[in-house]
Amino acid sequence: MDQSIADLRKNYTLTGLTEAEANPNPFVQFRLWFNQALEAQFLEPNAMTIATVTPDGKPSARMVLLKDFDERGFVFYTNYDSAKGQQLAQTPWAALVFWWDALERQVRIEGTVEKVSQEESDAYFASRPWESRLGAWVSDQSRVIESREVLENRLQALKDKYQAQDVPRPPHWGGFRVMPEKIEFWQGRPNRLHDRLCYKWIEGEKWIIERLSP
């Protein structure tokens, strides 16, 4: 018998999150939670949803992988000519969501977006597996193609061209940094009375922490 979707639910009971426990620096708090997600052996603990805005104001979301973070912001890499790349070029704002279900935790981040330096993009690109570097040249991301054979033929042609030699970074491929103005830490609690601590940046001053109603 198929289970009713309406009946799918879980009561969150693992732990709580208080203002006294939370680090006053949201990046330190994020690192703490991220390290705990690593220890919990999630398949991809750095997977995150990124939401952007289309030219006509419609939301657009997809999963990407976090590749670095520090107090400047949260970094991911992509094709600058992709749909999200073009959307960020026009409207440089984004929202990120991390969901670590086994820990009953969610992190939401909102902020402005900028490209990382060419040096940062070069360094990360050079660290990727050889065929992944070729893949950055193969894919005209978000464009319509006739079949998968188009990709496979392009990949083989590039393998023949480079033959395990160094592959340069495409000029249309690199990193974005989301520079947060708001970071919310959500911890599931019993009876849907979850803990929500929201860090907000007061321009030129400091981070403040506010508790939000669930």
Swiss-Prot record:
The UniProt record lists the keyword Oxidoreductase: yes
Gene3D superfamilies hit by this protein: Electron Transport, Fmn-binding Protein, Chain A (2.30.110.10)
EC numbers on record: 1.4.3.5
Binding site for FMN: R62, M63, V64, L65, L66, K67, Y77, T78, K84, Q106, Q141, S142, W186, R196
Residues that, per the record, bind substrate: R9, K10, N11, Y12, K67, Y124, R128, S132, R192, L193, H194
UniProt KW keywords: Flavoprotein, FMN, Oxidoreductase, Pyridoxine biosynthesis
Role description: Catalyzes the oxidation of either pyridoxine 5'-phosphate (PNP) or pyridoxamine 5'-phosphate (PMP) into pyridoxal 5'-phosphate (PLP).
Family affiliation: Belongs to the pyridoxamine 5'-phosphate oxidase family.
Complex and partners: Homodimer.
Protein name: Pyridoxine/pyridoxamine 5'-phosphate oxidase
